Amino acid sequence: MKKNKPSPLFYYGTLILSLLSCNAAALETDAEQPITIDSNTATYDDLTATSTYIGNVVSIQGSIVVHSDKLVVFFVDGDAEKLVFTGNKAKFKQTPNVGAKDITGESFIGHYFPKANQLVLIDTATIWKDDGIYASDLIEYNTKTSLVNAGEKTTDTKRVHVILKPKSKDKSINKSTNQ
């Protein structure tokens, strides 16, 4: 009895699917990834348990990338509890899922809480997500769920500005209506 060997296409397809599933798992677990930081200068203060990075700072955790002028990391029991980044403007991006558009944002000040998956943008903050633009003096962004909360609930004087762009129409729909 002759056994059928799987075709090379089968092996190729299996390889592609396994690579895509590994990539998706990495994006869902950004908070479990180490934080890497590159900068022009770095100092660590053992008394305050903080490290300060200045000059063209790039910090990366999984698919989250932040570019800033200055970054201060606050440690609790040796773990990075809070990262405060500042810049003119500091910028971030995250790839939420494989094949999805990157979510990007900017502000003058940002606070990132890795354990809580929370990014808070302060002072002229903007987030570009899907086809929408969110602008406010305060925006909270959950890096795990991609949920955006803009504005302050305690004040009526500060407004949130949102632009929702319409999705482009499918070309096949246009063809059927023109015939």
Spans of features found by a protein language model:
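Mature-chain termini and adjacent capping regions
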Residues: 1-179
